[in-house]
Swiss-Prot record:
GO molecular function, one term: adenosylcobinamide-GDP ribazoletransferase activity
Transmembrane segments: 36-56, 59-79, 114-134, 137-157, 170-190, 199-219
InterPro entries (UniProt xref): CobS
Pathway(s): Cofactor biosynthesis; adenosylcobalamin biosynthesis; adenosylcobalamin from cob(II)yrinate a,c-diamide: step 7/7
Compartments (UniProt record): Cell membrane
Name of the gene this protein is made from: cobS
Essential cofactor(s): Mg(2+)
Name of protein: Adenosylcobinamide-GDP ribazoletransferase
Organism of provenance: Clostridium botulinum (strain Okra / Type B1)
Catalytic activity: alpha-ribazole + adenosylcob(III)inamide-GDP = adenosylcob(III)alamin + GMP + H(+); alpha-ribazole 5'-phosphate + adenosylcob(III)inamide-GDP = adenosylcob(III)alamin 5'-phosphate + GMP + H(+)
Source species taxonomy: Bacteria, Bacillati, Bacillota, Clostridia, Eubacteriales
GO process annotations (BP): cobalamin biosynthetic process
Function: Joins adenosylcobinamide-GDP and alpha-ribazole to generate adenosylcobalamin (Ado-cobalamin). Also synthesizes adenosylcobalamin 5'-phosphate from adenosylcobinamide-GDP and alpha-ribazole 5'-phosphate.
GO terms for cellular component: plasma membrane
Length: 248
């Protein structure tokens, strides 16, 4: 029980700004087991967003609430995944060789491609969530972050790391397939309960496809994955899920 709590708190500490203030075991096996809790952390974030939406929907118009929810997400996650998307776009669209791309991705400064990617990411999230709320799919506020984290887990099934050292290496190739498939089954079952089978399976297939295409792009550009590409995967997974859900 103590080890389970350790791994759960480790995921909260690693992926959010929620203060844990505990000396936690941070071995590779802790992250391997803790992967089970990544969608749980996403559920906590999405659940908090949904509660904010419910609390404000009778006082503010939906478009204003969605802006506040996006701001809340950026604050509670520290913009971790959005930063990964920006760094990935800066590197990949620089059209340089592998070593130079990785150097660009490690640079703390944001470039033009990263800026454009963030603007598009935020605009799409805003418009898609706003449209889905008007359509009666406010549960997407909760489900999108979870599906995004699920896509990270699937990407991490690869053992191809682009760097010898990096924060992403503690996850890449360090995933348990049974854990991933178990938590995915639970998430899809819950999504089916709220959205129906068709509105669950079709967007999820789209997310898996985008995840695989990103994986192929990473192999082509830097011969593997980094922590930044995992963050980019989350953002692309969320956008893909919301976009297809709105379309069907």
């Amino acid at each position: 029980m103590k080890s389970i709590l350790n791994d759960f708190l480790l995921m909260i500490q690693f992926f959010t700004r929620i203060p844990v203030n505990k000396n936690l075991q941070c071995e590779k096996e802790n992250f391997r087991r803790g992967a089970f809790f990544l969608p749980v952390v996403a559920f906590i974030i999405g659940g908090m967003e949904f509660l904010i939406y419910l609390a404000l929907k009778n006082f503010l118009p939906p478009n204003v609430i969605i802006v506040l929810l996006i701001l809340f997400t950026a604050m509670i996650t520290g913009g971790l995944h959005m930063d990964g998307l920006a760094d990935t776009c800066d590197g990949f669209f620089s059209l340089r060789d592998k070593e130079r791309i990785i150097e660009i991705m490690k640079d703390s400064r944001i470039g033009s491609y990263g800026t454009i990617a963030l603007i598009i990411d935020l605009l799409l999230k805003y418009q898609l969530l706003y449209s889905l709320v008007l359509k009666g799919y406010s549960i997407a506020i909760v489900l999108a972050p979870i599906i995004g984290r699920i896509s990270i887990l699937f990407l991490c099934l690869s053992k191809r790391t682009a760097k010898k050292n990096g924060s992403g290496n503690i996850f890449i190739g360090n995933m348990s397939k049974p854990i991933i498939f178990f938590i995915t089954t639970i998430v899809l079952a819950l999504s089916t309960y709220f959205l129906g089978l068709r509105a669950t399976i079709i967007p999820f297939i789209g997310v898996l496809l985008i995840t695989y295409l990103l994986y192929l792009l990473c192999l082509n550009k830097i011969n593997g994955l980094t922590g930044d590409t995992l963050g980019a995967c989350n953002e692309l997974g969320e956008i893909t899920f919301l976009l297809i859900l709105l379309m069907i």
